[in-house]
Regions:
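Short acidic-glycine-tyrosine-enriched beta hairpin
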Residues: 74-90
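Short beta-strand His + acidic residue motifs that chelate non-heme Fe in jelly-roll/DSBH
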Residues: 50-52, 70-71, 88, 93-100
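Conserved short histidine dyad/triad with adjacent acidic residue
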Residues: 24, 38-55, 90
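Beta-rich strand-turn-strand
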Residues: 77-79, 97-102
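A short hydrophobic beta-strand segment most commonly corresponding to one strand
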Residues: 60, 87, 101-120
Length: 124
């Protein structure tokens, strides 16, 4: 058994190549080999969001605070709130972030394939 204590891993500001606005990433866990899963708590300030991206093995978001938006390519922008769970299928192009006037925090869970968990694309 291994316990990861809250606050033992430093917060990191989301890189401007991958995010618009201010985003904070708090690593939660990265399972040891041979497991592939990892997770982070991500906080988006009002209006902040990800660039378009995909995940080779999909992604689960669990909204924990605030109000946000998520959109898949070709779909409508969907409002997401605390308690909502969002699943993006492997290779599904999408973005997610805070609503224009409200911050949003979610836990993001994804798995590595060939050493990567995400493929970043264009920003809007």
């Amino acid at each position: 058994m291994e316990i990861k204590r809250v606050g033992t891993q430093p917060s990191a500001k989301g890189p401007s190549d991958w995010f618009t606005g201010t985003v904070w990433i708090d690593p939660l866990f990265q399972a040891p080999d041979p497991a592939l899963v990892q997770g982070a708590s991500v906080t988006f300030e009002p209006g902040a969001r990800t660039a378009w991206h995909t995940h080779p093995l999909g992604q689960t978001l669990i909204v924990t605070a605030g109000c946000g938006w998520a959109q898949r390519e070709g779909g409508h922008i969907e409002e997401i709130r605390p308690g909502d769970v969002v699943w993006f299928s492997p290779g599904e192009k999408h973005w997610h972030g805070a609503a224009p006037t409200t911050a949003m925090t979610h836990i993001a869970i994804q798995e590595k394939k060939d050493g990567r968990v995400v493929d970043w694309m264009e920003r809007q």
